[in-house]
Design a protein with these regions (language model features):
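Intrinsic structural disorder/low-complexity segments
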Residues: 6, 14-15, 28, 305
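Glycine-centered signal
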Residues: 7, 21, 25-26
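Bacterial N-terminal signal peptides
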Residues: 10-21
């Protein structure tokens, strides 16, 4: 049993029932309503053709100026795009302003024109984490919103979880903790929805996962454990053969399966040998895949069962490593990117299919953090890491590096680059994962939100 499991058993409890699993059924839709779209898979369920080439003058439908930076992703709900930002403090490393000026924003834009329809600001609860160190790699707007098509839910760290309707009216605000991250990395896990429950991973704030009533913000359950303090990934959902949904989350050394109705731990599994979990797990046909850095390796686990499922449910273990971005599953293969290297492995066996460096860009632009992968620098932050995750649509993989190189790769068993695009020659930081809807890509930087489309 992993390092945190004894504490978990006491704090979360064990719900005992047998569990075989399959994928949550998803229908094709024109919305992209959470981090990495349908169940966090990063894979579009649409059939619309997606663009392959673009530039500042080709297939760029619109460009909107944002009121501040952020590394959260945009989401799309009908004819509206939502994205979060921050302003007033810590906008860059030369900013000497006071924390009391810190504000977070939820921005709503018209998806067809890029016009800002409304901007709701939320003052920060102080003290906040100081801007600096690794915290400056992603900042104060790292959590991607989530929507049920009726309302939009945001997680603003110590300022709590907040619900707005689609016209920008605030419905409720619930505080989830005021803890400061001892590592000074902050928190980044995005909220997700299950039926009427908003699930918030308040890792730094309270070392807890919370289930909130999405209509009122009232706390339904809270599951606390020290292991959550070093978790930055976003959970996924899976179902068992009885039709019961489980939350699955990667934490240091382990995977956890929890009941979303109660927050109780149903199963756990020894996973990667890493004291932190930065990326998110992904799920396909009841198999949970994880790839971590810091020497953690990779793993596939059949979700379900009860208590410790390490001996019974591990499908394979591998030595592949990843740092920040989350993988994607497609057509029996798993794709992921780390330090400008494209990786593809067999999802059934974990065996490597290819590992090749991405083609060189035609530009040497780097964001202001420093050349060649400095803090908030091009080609990734610490150690040259890119923070955005790949997504897939129309049989093509889209991956955006921090300096704005936008790769389009064919999703096949060999590295086949279709294009390397850019939307700007300016110095901007692209730390967010793109979104896609109706064949249109939405990509945000620390300064702008871009809509890339072949449609008029």
């Amino acid at each position: 049993m992993g390092y945190f499991s004894p504490r978990l058993i006491a704090q979360l409890g064990i719900s005992l029932f047998a569990s075989a699993t399959w994928t949550v059924q998803l229908t094709a839709e024109e919305n992209w309503t959470r981090f990495r779209g349908p169940n966090g898979s990063g894979v579009s369920t649409e059939s619309d053709p997606a663009p392959t080439t673009w530039s500042a003058t080709e297939n760029l439908k619109w460009k909107a100026t944002l009121p501040g930076p952020g590394s959260s992703s945009p989401i799309i709900v009908g004819n509206k795009v939502f994205v979060t930002c921050w302003s007033g403090y810590g906008v860059d490393r030369s900013d000497n302003s006071d924390q009391s000026n810190l504000k977070r924003h939820l921005i709503c834009l018209d998806r067809y024109t890029g016009n800002i329809l409304w901007d709701q600001t939320v003052a920060a609860d102080l003290p906040e984490d100081e801007y600096g160190g690794m915290f400056a790699e992603h900042g104060y707007a790292s959590h991607t919103p989530v929507s049920d098509g009726k309302n939009v839910y945001v997680f603003f760290g110590k300022s709590g979880a907040i619900a707005f309707d689609l016209d920008g009216k605030q419905l409720w605000q619930t505080k989830v903790g005021t803890g400061l991250d001892g590592r000074r990395w902050g928190s980044a896990s995005s909220p997700i929805l299950h039926n009427n429950i908003l699930i918030v991973t308040a890792a730094a704030e309270s070392h807890a996962i919370l289930g909130l009533d999405k209509e009122t913000g009232k706390e339904i359950w809270r599951a606390e454990a020290e292991g959550l303090g070093s978790t930055w990934g976003t959970p996924v959902l899976t179902k068992n053969d009885e039709g019961k949904t489980q939350i699955v989350l990667g934490v240091p050394y382990e995977f956890w399966g929890l009941d979303p109705e109660t927050g109780k731990l149903t199963w756990y599994c020894e996973a990667m040998n890493s004291d932190s979990y930065c990326s998110s797990v992904i799920e396909h046909d009841g198999i949970i895949f994880g790839i971590e850095g810091r020497g953690g390796g990779s793993i596939a686990v059949k979700a379900g069962g009860k208590k410790d499922i390490t001996q019974s449910n591990v499908v394979w273990r591998g030595r592949n490593n990843n740092r920040i971005s989350t993988p994607i599953y497609y057509d029996g293969r798993i794709y992921f990117f780390s330090s400008r290297v494209a990786n593809c492995i067999n999802a059934k066996t974990g065996e490597e299919i290819y590992q090749e460096r991405l083609p060189a860009s035609t530009t040497t632009n780097n964001p202001a953090g420093g050349p060649g992968g400095g803090r908030r620098g091009g080609g990734g932050g610490r150690g040259g890491q890119d923070y955005g995750s790949p997504i897939l649509a129309d049989g093509k993989i889209y991956f955006v590096t921090r300096n704005g190189d936008m790769y389009v790769l064919k999703a096949t068993d060999k590295l086949e680059s279709l294009a390397v695009n850019r939307v700007t020659s300016d110095t901007e930081d692209f730390s967010a994962t793109p979104a896609i809807s109706k064949g249109e890509l939405f990509v945000r930087s620390n300064k702008h939100l871009y809509c890339i489309s072949t449609k008029n």
